[in-house]
């Protein structure tokens, strides 16, 4: 390792500004992805190929493809950024992302595949013999899908702005959105299966290799963890007033009392408040305190675990397995594959706390979400400029793979809902397979344009924050529907529809209101949230009440309408 570093230290990157290695690796990733899309386009002929890849995907390929689709920009970039920003409190993200597949394995994957539908709305209509329920299910496919495309677009804009300094965030969103939309319109589900399987292994390579090399140069994980702990203890022991006066400008905006490392636990906020000597200091600290943080954490856990089992673009992939047994085996392997991946992003977050505190003072595409992209560049300041450029190129390639694979899956899921469930089943039931394929391609283009438009509006928000909201909507709508429909014979159509509509729409509405104030800063709405912090938390992350409400309504209404079974 020492000899290799000494050799690479002798070389300098060819240019300043746009790093050629970063541009090269990113371009190669895009070219391979689009090339695979064109190659498989010739093999995707039937409706079954476009919607469920002919139901012929093997366990290994499908597990890799599902993992590639699931490990989104939130996993590759967002987890590290949240750990850097919030410390231990953010570890629930990777843990719950992986645990959600246990619910899928135990309760949903096998029965869902044995049902033999093309889409989740297919399942909804088939289970309850209700075309109306299909329409409701399609609406929630779109609601969840559009909310989930926004963090992918945020990742795309952040990465492109990093690769091309000075490039506007929106330009990156538009360019990446156009490329992915073209890829999906060409190949459908069969086309993206190969792409997503390849992208999973690319992401694993891109998240693991750089962190091992970085640790060899800047110090191992434990040393940086100890540095974080020391800073935390120093701040907690010092009078808050003194600490605030000496505070660097690099501290996170929402926790100004802490050192450049950010907060490790919310308990430290209380410690600093108690140390405040004047009412003014105490009031300032109270204003920066995140209220009801434990309640938010519990709600987040419910959203991520249950939401994973309710994501339409993930669930539809189980229809590509040959049978229910293969679907269960696929789920087991997915848990292993994503579990291995999630070991590494928190390490980036911890090291980032020590080495890139300047990210705390930035917002949007320049904030902590880009710590994975930023850490390799530190090697340039340690006499390894070429090595830093190469590793930066690898991490950028992984970021491209992350948001491209997930956005592809979302586009297929939403386009299938429009082409198969709306056009093929409602608007024109006698349409030919060729007409449905054409409808799929047009739907992909329309949804791609809308997704890009939404993505340009969320630059200020954290990637994982957006993902948590999408998961909450899925947890309050699709998870209760699937779980109760599979395991309770007494469920009626009216019960399922009532629970899904009330729980899902209330979660959607509350999330929409908080996001609206975060993005556009409406004064009246912002003042209302300040005056009602508990209500703000319950609306920002509604899973803790929306999921039980949805299930309760399903049970009560089904009991009241048992005669309709």
What are these model-predicted stretches?
Residues 2-565:
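Membrane-embedded helix-loop-helix hairpins and adjacent transmembrane boundary segments
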